[in-house]
Structure formats: structure tokens, C-alpha cells
UniProtKB/Swiss-Prot annotation:
Cofactor comment: Binds 2 magnesium or manganese ions per subunit.
Cofactor(s) recorded in Swiss-Prot or TrEMBL: Mg(2+); Mn(2+)
GO cellular component: cytoplasm
Residue ranges occupied by any ATP-grasp domain in the UniProt entry: 100-295
InterPro entries xref list: ATP-grasp (IPR011761), ATP_grasp_subdomain_1 (IPR013815), D-Ala_lig_Van_CS (IPR000291), D_ala_D_ala (IPR005905), Dala_Dala_lig_C (IPR011095), PreATP-grasp_dom_sf (IPR016185)
Catalytic activities: 2 D-alanine + ATP = D-alanyl-D-alanine + ADP + phosphate + H(+)
Residue numbers binding Mg(2+) 2: 262, 264
NCBIfam families: PRK01372.1 (NF002378)
Name recorded for this polypeptide: D-alanine--D-alanine ligase
Keywords: ATP-binding, Cell shape, Cell wall biogenesis/degradation, Cytoplasm, Ligase, Magnesium, Manganese, Metal-binding, Nucleotide-binding, Peptidoglycan synthesis
Organism the protein comes from: Desulfovibrio desulfuricans (strain ATCC 27774 / DSM 6949 / MB)
Length: 306
């Protein structure tokens, strides 16, 4: 197929996107596909024209545009198939506050949260007790994520987020370990247990640097907990109306409780990424995983045209 590989963009996660796309090109070409690399930052105005000249668009964007559903909506306008969630599901998943409302309504276990769209007054106090995890409401890759133990630390982190033009969401710091689980089609993949080495939580360095974290796959958490993680992952995927694939992140508490953190609709595709690691556990190499995502995207496009 003639594949338009859409990457780059202008979000703070641009470099992560480019790194993943560089890994995808040889895997696709080895399977006989003709790949056109398309950097959204350099030629956003040419997206629709380029999409019309290709059989499939592989989206490897992080943040907005891309995870916000804009690119998907544009591709839908010209009938170009792509992998993963459509515009609405992408937008809902990217907005953590909106997604958490949907999770809560669906009966999924998610932590309490405060949403702060603009810098509050000096007399304001967070509703939740310290310490708090503070992050961008629409950011990803654990960028602009911090732990605040008091108002001074909270103001510092919020200031960085607001300076980037984004809103703040904060949650209590939950004891436990992080578990992540992908969906491929309607099938949950084997979960991964994440133990950060660089830092005490899964931040940007832990996520993308070699040896930044120990990622144990399949997660050594027993069959019962594994099944529960997979059940919740599929439930979150469906609650947001997603398609094709996604990845859900959880905190596994000391009492074996599970708390859903968020769902990623365009999971990372670098050499250290989580979903490719999970796919390898079930026998799919990187090229086979990409092929499966394209098969799912083509089938989804046909359904929309019926």
C-alpha cells in the first residue's frame, strides 16, 4: 500500500513522535509498503491533498494536533483510512477531566481530581489533600508532570502548565505500582508492570530513556489480577468509544486495588514503547503489529462507508 506516515506536529511531544515514525519506516518498507513521511509542522496545509493520494494514513502524533481528533476528522473528510480512534473518542481521551467523568459514569475505578482551568487566587486551596500529582489536562508523555507537597510547589508546577497555554488537573498521590495494558482490536494484550529506575514515578525520563524503568511483561501479578486489568482496559476503551487500539494506565495498590489513570489513543511506537512490547509477548513483531493496525483501520473505514 501507499502509506502516508503522519508525524512531527508542533506539540511539546514532537520529538517523541518523530522518533517513533523513524522506527516505523523500515518496518513498513520491509513488508513491501511505499511510505511517504509527512511532517505536519512543515506542511499542514497539504494534509488533505496528500491523504487523497495514499491508500492509508498511519498517524504517529502525540498531543495536539493528532490525539485531539483534528487529523482524524480531516482524514474522514476525504475518506482516507487510518488506524485507531475517530475524532470524538480521541478528543475525549486526550482531555483527562472529560475522560475521568466518563470513567466515573461507567463505574470504572478512577481517582478523585481537581480541574483548574486558570491560575487561582491566592486564597484558593485545592480540594484534595497534599501530596498531589499535578499535570496538564491534555498533555502526554509525562511532560509537565510534578508532585506537589505544598502550595508553593503547586504554584510552581501550575505556572509551568499555564505558561504553556494548558489547563491543570490534579489527583492524589496513590501508593502502588503502575500497570499498563493495551488493546488490539477488541483483545486485551498482556499487561506490563512498570518499576521506574530514574525517579520515583514514571516521568518522561523513565518513559523514553534506555534503562529508565524496568518493564516486566507479562506483569508478574497473577492470573486473577491480570484478568481484572484486561477487563478494565477493555471497559475503558469501550466507554470512550475507541476503535482499533489503545493503552490504559493503572495504579496497582498495595491491597491489589486498581485505579484507572488515563487512556492513550495513539500509544508510543519507539524502541522502548509499551504496546509493541506487549505485542511481542503474543508473537507479533513490530511490522506485524503495524500490519494488524492497518487491517483494523481499513475494516473500520469500510464500515463507515456502508
Amino acid at each position: 500500500m501507499k502509506i502516508l506516515l503522519i508525524a512531527g506536529g508542533w506539540s511539546p511531544e514532537r520529538q517523541v513522535s518523530l522518533n517513533g515514525a523513524r522506527a516505523m519506516v523500515p518496518a513498513l518498507e520491509a513488508r513491501g509498503h511505499e511510505v511517504t513521511f509527512f511532517d505536519l509542522l512543515e506542511n499542514f496545509n497539504g494534509l488533505l491533498a496528500a491523504a487523497e493520494q495514499h491508500d492509508f494514513a498511519l498517524i504517529n502524533l502525540h498531543g495536539a494536533p493528532g490525539e485531539d481528533g483534528l487529523v482524524q476528522a480531516m482524514l474522514d473528510q476525504v475518506g482516507c483510512p487510518y488506524q485507531g480512534a475517530g475524532p470524538a473518542g480521541s478528543f475525549l481521551a486526550l482531555n483527562k477531566c472529560a475522560a475521568k467523568q466518563i470513567f466515573r459514569r461507567a463505574g470504572l475505578p478512577t481517582a478523585d481530581w481537581d480541574f483548574v482551568p486558570a491560575f487561582p487566587g491566592k486564597d484558593w486551596q485545592p480540594r484534595l489533600p497534599y501530596p498531589l500529582f499535578v499535570k496538564s489536562n491534555t498533555g502526554g508523555s509525562s511532560l509537565r508532570l510534578g508532585r506537589a507537597r505544598n502550595r508553593a510547589e503547586l504554584d510552581d508546577i501550575m505556572g509551568q502548565i499555564f505558561a504553556a497555554g494548558e489547563e491543570v488537573i490534579m489527583e492524589p498521590v496513590l501508593p502502588g505500582r503502575e500497570v499498563t495494558c493495551g488493546i488490539l482490536g477488541e483483545d486485551p494484550l498482556p499487561p506490563i508492570l512498570i518499576e521506574p529506575v530514574a525517579g520515583d514515578f514514571f516521568n518522561y525520563e523513565s518513559k523514553y530513556e534506555q534503562d529508565g524503568a524496568r518493564e516486566l511483561c507479562p506483569a508478574p501479578i497473577g492470573d486473577e489480577l491480570t484478568a481484572r486489568v484486561q477487563e478494565l482496559t477493555l471497559a475503558a476503551h469501550r466507554a470512550l468509544g475507541l476503535r482499533g487500539y489503545s493503552r490504559a494506565d493503572f495504579i496497582l495498590g498495595p491491597d491489589d486495588s486498581l485505579t484507572l489513570l488515563e487512556v492513550n489513543t495513539l500509544p508510543g511506537m519507539t524502541a522502548t514503547s509499551l504496546v509493541p512490547r506487549e505485542a511481542r509477548t503474543i508473537g507479533l513483531d513490530f511490522g506485524q503489529l503495524l500490519e494488524r493496525l492497518m487491517e483494523l483501520g481499513l475494516a473500520d473505514c469500510k464500515k463507515k462507508q456502508m
